[in-house]
Amino acid sequence: MGLFSKIFSNARKPEGFFGRMMVNGMNGGSHARMAQWGLSFVDVAQEAGVLDIGCGGGANIARLLRRCPKGTVQGIDYSPVSVKKSQEVNAAAIAAGRCKVQEGSAATLPYADGEFDLVTAFETVYFWPGIEECFRGVLRVLKEGGRFLIVNEDDGLTGNNEKWEKMIDGMHTYTPDELRTHLTAAGFRDIAVHTNDQHHWLCATAAK
């Protein structure tokens, strides 16, 4: 495996030196711009309880904390490298009791029913096993009327996804129609999918 492939194969589950490089890169550049774009499609109450699944380098947790200054944000990721980085980035909020980051999987969310006002998933659903079952888990931990936000770097419509899917084991880039279908099957309502024509970003929102 070449250097380029070694680095980007860490996108699914960052590990070791290249994993640390990956999570650092997740926190800036186009990833930051895309996250801000995606967040423009949801309102976050000042006292909201938020969960960020696949929290990566922790920058989106920090953005969410700023959006709900009287609320709390929890993060979960199955990469110990990502958990450690997210904890470092959000150390002050963790010390203040406004943030918690833990290791875990989107397939078995360790939270109570109806715990969160908002659940976010930035650049992560590509890797979720059994996508509809994972979505049902998200639905379970949301409060009635709570929102689910998905933000993906690729809308699956350009053909670029084939290159990444060959390079990154277990990756699937969902098209807008695929996401609508899976969210509907999982029990979500008020589903909206937005795309960015310039960058081919994708954002989906859905309600419980």
Outline where the language-model segments fall:
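C-terminal alpha-helical "lid/dimerization" subdomain adjacent to the S-adenosyl-L-methionine
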Residues: G2-K6, N10, E15-N24, G28, ...
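A short glycine-rich, Lys/Arg-flanked "PGG" loop and its adjoining helix->strand segment in the class I
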Residues: E132-E144
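A short SAM/SAH-binding and catalytic strip from SAM-dependent methyltransferases
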Residues: L118-I131
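A short acidic, Gly/Pro-enriched loop at the edge of an enzyme's catalytic core
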Residues: A107-L118
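A generic alpha-to-beta junction signature in SAM-dependent methyltransferases
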Residues: V42-V44, R67-C68, L142
